[in-house]
Amino acid sequence: RVSLLHRLPMKIIDKVLKERITLMPGASVLLATMKAHGCYTALVSGGFTMFTEKIAASLGFDENHANVLIKNKGKLTGKVQKPILGKLAKVKQLESIAKKLNLNEKQVLAVGDGANDLGMLHRAGTGVALHAKPSVAEQCDIRINFGDLTSLLFIQGYAKEDFVFNPPSDHQPQPSH
């Protein structure tokens, strides 16, 4: 599918960000609340950095890891820089972040919805299948099938009174100009 991007101009990324990418409901409150309580957050995605960097910056993630689309002379090449961030790479990121923060992996909460998230979800102390495909959800002890991302706050023991409802960015990630 990435090969279909071959020769598309880079400005298409800004158009997609503006017209097609929306934040999941509750994302801003989730991140603002966790940051206000001293949590470290990382966005680890099988998507592309051209999108995740802007999303991570708008929400205040501490780290962002995703696949890098290769570009040349202002156009996409239809190729992805190696290594590909897939199932094993997500586990490695969890291990790396936990080690860097001197955490036991059992102190980590990971969230995902696809088969490439299962390794990470099983490795984390709290692995949450969020609106996941049935084949993924059935392999996880914690599942959120309804509700928004603030459900993750309740799982961590926050009360609604602890939520930060006035986060700095409760809108779409902004395209670069």
Mark where each language-model region is.
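C-terminal cap/substrate-recognition subdomain and adjoining C-terminal extension
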Residues: 6-177
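Helix-loop "lid/cap" segments that line or gate small-molecule binding pockets
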Residues: 1-4
